[in-house]
Amino acid sequence: MREIKSGVVLSKMRKILLFLGVFFYVSQAIAVQDSLETEDRKTFEFIADSLNEMIFLGNNPDFRCKFYDKIDSFRTTGKGRINILHIGGSHVQADIFSHTVRCRIDSLNGEFKPSRGILFPYQVAKTNNPTNYKVTYAGEWKSSRNIKKDREAILGVTGMAVSTMDTIAEIRIKLNPKDSVGRWSFTRLKLLGYAEHPKVMPLLKLGNSSFLHPIYDSVASTYTYILSVPMDSLNLIISQTDTISHRFTLTGLLLENDEPGIVYHSIGVNGASVPSYLSCPNFERDLNLIRPDMVIFAIGINDAVPQNFSKNNFIANYDSLLSKFRKVSPECFFVFVSNNDSYRKIKRRYRRTRYQLNTNGVLAREAFAMLAEKHDGSLWDLFSIMGGLDSIKKWEESGLSQKDKVHFTKAGYTLVGNLFFEAFLNSYNNKD
């Protein structure tokens, strides 16, 4: 990391200690990175380590420089909030890749403990929930997803929603189910959603008979709960006070506190494509709650499945999505992740399902490079780093890819996350 020049004296001793603390954590991160690099490359020689970098392809480096300047400012002053948003499909919904990066980047926060960011209770929608937070629920809920044309709910930035009219409806979330240290907590909860009638209200249960009422913002369509002490779990009940039940819809939960540092948000929906997110009416409105400083775009694996995949249409769809981000965060830095190498499923009548190499990965990689150049962003070329066309077979043989040759195993996602963090850290270290 860049050292502070001699003669720079911070106004308070605490700031000096802060810098030393953050520098120690960053040094630790680099040491762990070196260890991982040695172990991973020895075991998996098919990984093109020389290509593991964030390649800046734009003409104007201002977005990139301003983002890294914000990290520098936080490191030296201990002030400021930096929001990173990682958006994609099933690779991100599983939250192994993204949570690996989240935890590695969290090491840069030093003594500070900013919040976990936005999340969705996937378990309530009866789909796979990340294992790093636990969700349980009561009552009947119906789900809506951005991959479906027929939806009961109006969707926002998460691309998901759950709705209920049940009088016993309840959602419980534990942020640190496997972490004895209890890293993640919040002092402010923003529930994204809406009610069809004033007499249905989400309440935060604090004890056996204690409930916290929210502050409702009709413009942002959020319910905000202010807590007096940090919490690492929540229990939401849907209160029905009318003689008949009314529908309530939840589209996301934003966990916040006032700690400075880097917050790593992740949004993913199984099967989602770029048009899936474009179809969410409240996407831009909800994005204002995050206002990302950097966005990691990892949408594309589903767009490239059809044999008639059009690179031009893919770029045009992305242009439309990126314009939404520019409206909300004009100085946001974009990082594009190329699709992993993959196979597509071929169904044959009266025959077993088989898989066929999807050569569209090459076209998608070209499209991501063009997007990075056009929008002054960087490319993290996962397709090439993992070995290029048909390399997914080697990943499967090594226990890093599932049999469908699309999704990774836990070990594979963790490796991808570590590779990404390594490229991110190297890009930051060599920014000058």
Q: Predicted segment positions?
A:
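Conserved, well-ordered alpha-helix/loop/beta-strand core segments that scaffold catalytic motifs
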Residues: 294-300, 318-322, 333-338
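Sec-dependent signal peptide cleavage junction
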Residues: 29-73
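Catalytic His-Asp segment of secreted/periplasmic serine-dependent ester chemistry enzymes
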Residues: 342-432
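Bacterial Sec-dependent N-terminal signal peptides
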Residues: 1-40, 432
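Loop/turn elements at helix/coil->beta-strand transitions in domains of secreted/extracellular proteins
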Residues: 80-83, 260-263, 291-294, 329-334, ...
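Alpha-helical scaffolding within the catalytic cores
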Residues: 59-72, 277-287, 319-321
